[in-house]
């Protein structure tokens, strides 16, 4: 992986949400640095002032921290905008050495000459000797012949004939460097040895490799372009169409360990048949050479299943701690004083075995802490038929007398159901809806035990009154 100390960088732009693709690239970079005993640099490419916002930079740092890439464990964040003078100096050097020239061609003028402004620049200003001035961008003088060969750990050695690479812009008319140049200057001066990034940047690589050479680098960095991430229709993930914001998964209750494990599978696989593996195993076995170049399918259903498995592997105490943010405002719809930690703890193991994301805990246990059962109208209409009113009355009378314990409550309802010609499954339906508000949920009798006799009896009576009109 090259000689000397390995230095990688993760260079996101603070122009919106933190994409799951960016999270994967960050993890790949982090692991390469960790395995090599090298350095991870966070460089925030904030040169697009019209689109950047400080809160998005904060969001990047927070998201990385959630993934285990914590401040203090890396260099940065370095704001690319703080290095604007270095970028300008590099542009001036390219011009002074005859490796770049000024151009005043507009898109319209190019279209007139070529018939198509999308065909690329035709080199019209190459030998005009223009000086810097308003409306004049600086273009790199691409070699007329030869081939630029990119050695990529994932994609082999793609070749780019130089004649197909247009004289590309490296600095705008105001002197500010464009992404291509700023990126190379920063990588070169920061001593970056490995550039690990998304496949969409591969087309930029021959241009950047030419700039590395022009700016005096002995060799380009080690390139590694990780595969594009696609949805179920094999379309590239889009923030306009797909659920791609890492923050949305975090806020929904995905565990960072599950997310990290799943993201690592987007182009790579751990040894053996198991995909759910300890992070220590991933950290000790990950190698860029094993990353596949083919598109990686982001399967939300699989991620959710992963998360559910990670939740089930927690201890009950860890699970209770993990769901704590959802058991209080603003996530919880009940008053803070209504929360009963003992009642929740009694049902926590049952809930843990059923949730796939932590936020699912709220509708699973809200009946415990709300003053009234959160009745689902469709569930009510389906369950409260036939002898429901009489059954609820009989259950109420029996439950007022017997021991308040799940098995006893079950036996009691079984007995009442038989009197009404109902098997236990049918007899449970109106009781469940009356007490919990829903037709499905945690095991009924454990739920009743946790809810308590007084509240259960009150809700059974209220449900019967609603059915009978008084």
UniProtKB/Swiss-Prot annotation:
UniProt xrefs under Pfam families: Anticodon_2, tRNA-synt_1c
Coiled-coil region(s): none
Main location, first listed in the record: cytoplasm
Domain of life according to the entry: Bacteria
Motif ('KMSKS' region): 236-240
Ranges spanned by the short sequence motif 'HIGH' region, renumbered to the chain: 12-22
Binding-site residues for ATP, renumbered to this chain: 239
Keywords: Aminoacyl-tRNA synthetase, ATP-binding, Cytoplasm, Ligase, Metal-binding, Nucleotide-binding, Protein biosynthesis, Zinc
Subunit description: Monomer.
Role this protein plays: Catalyzes the attachment of glutamate to tRNA(Glu) in a two-step reaction: glutamate is first activated by ATP to form Glu-AMP and then transferred to the acceptor end of tRNA(Glu).
Name of the featured protein: Glutamate--tRNA ligase
Species, as recorded: Frankia casuarinae (strain DSM 45818 / CECT 9043 / HFP020203 / CcI3)
Organism taxonomic ancestry: Bacteria, Bacillati, Actinomycetota, Actinomycetes, Frankiales
């Amino acid at each position: 992986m090259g000689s000397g100390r390995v230095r990688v960088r993760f260079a996101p732009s603070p122009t919106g949400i933190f994409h799951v693709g960016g999270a994967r690239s960050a993890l790949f970079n982090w692991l390469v640095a960790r395995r090599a005993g090298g350095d991870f640099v966070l460089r925030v490419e904030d040169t697009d002032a019209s689109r950047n916002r400080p809160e998005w930079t904060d969001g990047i740092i927070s998201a990385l921290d959630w993934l285990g890439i914590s401040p203090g464990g890396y260099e940065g964040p370095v704001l690319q905008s703080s290095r604007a003078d270095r970028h300008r100096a590099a542009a001036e050097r390219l011009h002074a050495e005859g490796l770049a020239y000024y151009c005043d061609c507009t898109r319209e003028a190019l279209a007139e000459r070529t018939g198509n402004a999308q065909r690329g620049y035709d080199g019209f200003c190459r030998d005009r000797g223009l000086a810097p001035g308003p409306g004049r961008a600086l273009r790199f003088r691409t070699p007329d012949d030869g081939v630029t060969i990119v050695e990529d750990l994932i994609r082999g050695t793609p070749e780019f004939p130089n004649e197909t690479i247009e004289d590309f812009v490296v600095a705008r008319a105001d002197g500010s460097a464009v992404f291509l140049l700023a990126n190379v200057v920063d990588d070169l001066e920061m001593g970056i040895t490995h550039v690990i990034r998304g496949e969409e940047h591969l087309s930029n690589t021959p241009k950047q490799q030419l700039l590395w050479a022009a700016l005096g680098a002995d060799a380009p960095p080690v390139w590694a372009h990780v595969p594009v991430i696609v949805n179920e229709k094999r379309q590239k993930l889009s923030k306009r169409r797909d659920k791609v914001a890492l923050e949305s998964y975090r806020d929904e209750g995905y565990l960072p360990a599950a997310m990290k494990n799943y993201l690592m599978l987007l182009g790579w696989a751990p040894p053996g048949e198991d995909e759910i593996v300890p992070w220590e195993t991933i950290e000790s076995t990950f190698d860029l050479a094993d990353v596949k170049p083919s598109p990686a399918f982001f399967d939300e259903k699989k991620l959710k299943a992963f998360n559910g498995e990670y939740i089930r592997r927690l201890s009950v105490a860890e699970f209770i701690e993990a769901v704590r943010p959802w058991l209080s405002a603003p996530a919880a719809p009940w008053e803070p004083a209504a929360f009963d930690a003992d009642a929740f703890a009694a049902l926590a193991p049952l809930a843990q075995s059923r949730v796939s994301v932590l936020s699912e805990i709220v509708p699973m246990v809200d009946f415990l802490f709300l003053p009234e059962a959160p009745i689902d109208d469709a569930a009510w209409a389906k369950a409260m038929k036939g002898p429901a009113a009489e059954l609820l009355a009989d259950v109420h009378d029996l439950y007022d007398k017997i021991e308040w314990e799940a098995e006893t409550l079950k036996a009691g309802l079984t007995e009442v159901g038989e009197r009404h010609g109902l098997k236990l499954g049918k007899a449970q339906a109106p009781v469940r809806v009356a007490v919990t508000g829903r037709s499905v949920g945690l095991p009924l009798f454990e739920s009743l035990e946790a809810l308590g006799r007084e509240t259960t009896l009150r809700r059974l009576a209220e449900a019967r009154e609603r059915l009978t009109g008084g």
